[in-house]
Amino acid sequence: MNAFKQREVWFAIGSQHLYGPQTLQQVKAHAEQVVDSLNREAGLPVKLVLKPLVTTPDEITALCRDANYQPQCIGILAWLHTFSPAKMWIAGLSVLHKPLLQFHTQFNAQVPWDSMDMDFMNLNQTAHGGREFGFIGARMRQQHSVIAGHWQDPEAHRRIGQWMRVASAKQAGQQLKVARFGDNMREVAVTDGDKVGAQIQFGYSVNAYGIGDLVSVINEVSRGDVDTLIEEYEASYVLSDAAKINGAKRENLTDAARIELGMKRFLEQGNFQAFTTNFEDLHGMKQLPGLAVQRLMQQGYGFGGEGDWKTAALLRILKVMADGLHGGTSFMEDYTYHFQPGNDLVVGSHMLEVCPSIAREPKPLLDIQPLGIGGKADPARLIFSTPAGPAVNASLIDMGDRFRLLVNQVDTVEQPHPLPKLPVARAIWRAQPTLATAAEAWILAGGAHHTVFSQALDADMLRLYAEMHNIEFLLIDQDTTLPAFKNELRWNEAYYQLNRR
């Protein structure tokens, strides 16, 4: 995806002229060394760009305004090397719209016991300079993140990298366009919601298009382009007998390829990065898009079934966040349970649309099987299982007065038995802390049946995403108990009612 290409985080150093030019020169030299080291050795996904030292209110305000207007800048990392009186930051922070991270570090890792003098103390004042900066953020009620630790500490590197990923995802969300092919599945509640409110909160736009608009683009796809794509299928997947040349369903594969090319062309022409479909809106299409949706998700597009635009947008945003990390990220649905004492499991899947980025098999099976839902021809789909490992399920829901991000930590397991008659991709997991507690908590919180499933991301990154957007975050994990979770729901309700703007 190259999600972080041409992105940068501005590294800002705050100080004041009180200390004199020699001290400020040392601060600049230290900053250059820190930024150079972090860019070379910390494995950060986004480049740090050192900005000129800011020592006056006007310089700080100019920096913050410039950050807002430069599209390559996804946020500011601030280091208070010396004491920078925080009233100087009020005007700048008041206009700053990009994410802010305070890196509470200092140049030296240890105190030089034998040589430390007052010059050293004046130069290395992060310990209290950072507190002054933190106060003004708290006083202004401004959302910002804080990471404390030495700049050579791998844990600090990891956390800065996570913050960069979330800041990049936030910017991607602000630029995101979601196309809905058709409307919401009739009478379904949770997939609907306030699209205007979402655009105000997150920045992404959601617009619907008649299925005929898509069909007209699909019908323009040439046979030569279809044949080229089918050659790619044959190189990438294990084709079932029905899908092979002269197979009983070969024409269905041709139709699926034409649908994929048409959908991608439509999305590219409109600069959409996420989309939804609905099996109730298929007029003019030969089959429900399955293979097309799976492959588009693997290329980085967000997707939601049955018109679920919130999950489509969230999937795209989390794919940006996860770019380059080990593990995949997919549209998902809790489909059925396996109740067994000591071994309760959830089978996650969907009618067709599970992203191959989570596939365990190097070459998934490409098959064509009947699908009663939608009333169309048998659709092509990729069939695979998912590797074992930790994962999260995330659901963004509209609570009317606010958005809520609900996350359940799960442990994916290897498929324990063959599923010879199940013609869809799937993931199987143990919900934390138990299936019963996780399901009850999820239902009490109003979590959707659609989720984003990710083996690349963790709950900390999703919590940070929620914090950057000032939305509610609820976590169901190994430490969750139902009485405490119910209390959290009550407390949150009171907080958000009192904090309404």
Swiss-Prot record:
One Gene Ontology cellular component annotation held by this UniProt entry: cytosol
Tagged with keyword Isomerase: yes
Reactions that this protein is recorded to catalyse: beta-L-arabinopyranose = L-ribulose
Pfam families named among the record's database cross-references: AraA_central, AraA_N, Arabinose_Iso_C
Keywords of this entry: Arabinose catabolism, Carbohydrate metabolism, Isomerase, Manganese, Metal-binding
Pathway, per record: Carbohydrate degradation; L-arabinose degradation via L-ribulose; D-xylulose 5-phosphate from L-arabinose (bacterial route): step 1/3
GO molecular function per UniProt: L-arabinose isomerase activity; manganese ion binding
Known cofactor(s): Mn(2+)
Cofactor mode of binding and number, as noted: Binds 1 Mn(2+) ion per subunit.
Keyword Manganese: yes
UniProt GO BP: L-arabinose catabolic process to xylulose 5-phosphate
Residue numbers binding Mn(2+): E306, E333, H350, H450
Similarity comment: Belongs to the arabinose isomerase family.
Assembly mode: Homohexamer.
PANTHER family linked to this entry: L-ARABINOSE ISOMERASE (PTHR38464:SF1)
This protein's name: L-arabinose isomerase
Lineage summary: Bacteria, Pseudomonadati, Pseudomonadota, Gammaproteobacteria, Enterobacterales
